Amino acid sequence: GGGGTSGLFAFPRV
């Protein structure tokens, strides 16, 4: 649950 970014990418963090 939550969120994060890596460079130009965003992904749902587990």
Swiss-Prot record:
Localisation per UniProt entry: Secreted
Q: Which UniProt keywords apply?
A: Amidation, Neuropeptide, Secreted
| Chief place of localization | secreted
- Residues bearing Valine amide? 14
Gene Ontology biological process terms, A to Z:
neuropeptide signaling pathway
Gene Ontology cellular component terms for the protein in this record? extracellular region
Q: In which tissues is it expressed?
A: Expressed in the CNS and abdominal perisympathetic organs (aPSO). Not expressed in the ring gland, midgut or thoracic perisympathetic organs (tPSO) (at protein level).
Family note: Belongs to the periviscerokinin family.
What is the protein's given name?
Answer: CAPA-Periviscerokinin-1
Q: Output the lineage of the source organism.
A: Eukaryota, Metazoa, Ecdysozoa, Arthropoda, Hexapoda
